[in-house]
Amino acid sequence: MIDAHTHLDVRSFEDLEKMALSGIETIITCAHDPYKMSTPEVYLDHWDRLINLEVKRGEMAGVEVKVAVGVHPMGYPKNWEVLIKKLPEFLDNENVVAIGETGLHYLTEDEKNLLREQLYLAKDYNMPIIIHTPEKNKKEALIEILKILDEVKIKDSLVMIDHINKETVDLIDRDVYVGLTVQPSMKLTHEEAAEIIKNYNKKFILSSDLGSLKADIYALPRTKLYMKNIGVDEEKIIASVYKNAKGFYRL
């Protein structure tokens, strides 16, 4: 199994060990906003930590850790253009597999420009990109994201739109990867995620979105077992917990 979206820098070493013991082979840890992120230097140090420390912590725990670097819509400096210029330097690292997490949260024009610039980088560098959608105003945010994707003309195979739920899955009218987040306190229960996978034919990728808030380190094995128990097609199960993430991140 591959946990395709986490924030390991705010999780314990013991969590990594438990995930390895539960059958997780690879974990993707994404850039986010653990602080105010009020200056570019804070982001640069954050990216550096993910690449140089979180990968090593994974090795120590017996699980492969790969990294996504990007600028999160919930926290970024006013002069974020500096980070867009610096980001390509990090994309060459062998452990960086994607740009992200980026996306829309408050739906400001500045956020849209920030997302647009990261999408252009992903297009230019042929790099996968992880796009966040918010808990509130998710439909509105998704519609705006789809408009920006049309504008940038990035390949569908490079895009994962994340945190999708049963109210928004029908809005995705293209062959992008669709992220389902099993995080019962804020996003999907494992039962809800399983029902979406059972009833739709899309390129689903499951993740736990482990971070500083309440989450489930066993989200993937729990959902995998439940899908098996309710008769979800085995190919769909394997695709959602492993194969699609492997293809998206080119692991």
Curated annotation (Swiss-Prot):
InterPro entries the UniProt entry points to: DNase_TatD-rel_CS (IPR018228), Metal_Hydrolase (IPR032466), TatD-like (IPR001130), UCP005295 (IPR012022)
Q: What is the lineage of its organism?
A: Archaea, Methanobacteriati, Methanobacteriota, Methanomada group, Methanococci
Where does the UniProt annotation place the signal sequence?
none
Q: Which UniProt keywords apply?
A: Hydrolase, Metal-binding
Q: What does the record give as cofactor? A: a divalent metal cation
Please give the name of this protein.
Uncharacterized metal-dependent hydrolase MJ0761
Q: Give the Enzyme Commission number.
A: 3.1.-.-
For molecular function, the Gene Ontology terms on record are:
hydrolase activity, acting on ester bonds; metal ion binding
Any Pfam family the entry gives: TatD_DNase
Which SUPFAM superfamilies does the record match to this protein?
A: Metallo-dependent hydrolases (SSF51556)
Cofactor annotation remark: Binds 2 divalent metal cations per subunit.
EC category:
hydrolase
**PANTHER family linked to this entry:** HYDROLASE TATD (PTHR42658:SF1)
